[in-house]
């Protein structure tokens, strides 16, 4: 009797596993177009949920590709300078966490008007383009820019930091 029960449990388990693996396969009854459409919906949901607050802010702003590239340059240089011991004291308040940098940049930008953001990005791009010919000048500019952004990691007022940046860059 015990053997019969054990064999029955094993068979039930094997059937259950087989049914689960069949569910994982795409339904052959559906045409390819509807399967592709279904996959797109799932991918969009996943991507939307992965968007950072900075990405969400950028999507709400009317930034052109050049401005988006400049913002990416700025964010990446701040992440790069995070490990530099010569950067400002408050910059280290991020605790070495790169996500804190994006969070701080997002907070800083969200307190500014769209035209102020565009002006700032245009000025950064203009100076970056001038300095790009000489790697040493570009690195110096990156350090100056990172030092100028030191105030956003001290929870300083965005307008104050913006005015300081205008003088710096």
Swiss-Prot record:
Keywords per UniProt: Cell outer membrane, Membrane, Plasmid
As for subcellular location, the record says: Cell outer membrane
- Record bears the keyword tRNA-binding: no
- Keyword Membrane present in the record's keywords: the answer is yes
Q: Please provide one cellular component term from the Gene Ontology annotations of this protein.
A: membrane
The membrane topology term of the UniProt record is: Peripheral membrane protein
Top-rank taxon of the source lineage equals: Bacteria
* Name of this protein: Putative outer membrane protein BBA03
């Amino acid at each position: 009797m015990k053997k019969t029960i054990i064999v029955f449990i094993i068979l039930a388990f094997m059937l259950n596993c087989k049914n689960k693996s069949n569910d994982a396969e795409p339904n052959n009854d559906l045409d390819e177009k509807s399967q592709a459409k279904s996959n797109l919906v799932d991918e969009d949901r996943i991507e939307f949920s992965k968007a950072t607050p900075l990405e969400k802010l950028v999507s709400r702003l009317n930034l052109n590709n050049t401005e988006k590239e400049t913002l990416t340059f700025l964010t990446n240089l701040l992440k790069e300078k995070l490990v530099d011991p010569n950067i400002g004291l408050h910059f280290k308040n991020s605790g070495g966490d790169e996500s804190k940098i994006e969070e701080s940049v997002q907070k800083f930008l969200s307190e500014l008007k769209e035209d102020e953001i565009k002006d700032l990005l245009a000025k950064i791009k203009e100076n970056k383009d001038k300095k790009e010919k000489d790697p040493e000048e570009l690195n110096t500019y990156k350090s100056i820019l990172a030092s100028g952004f030191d105030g956003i990691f001290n929870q300083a007022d965005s307008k104050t930091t913006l005015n300081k940046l205008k003088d710096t860059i």
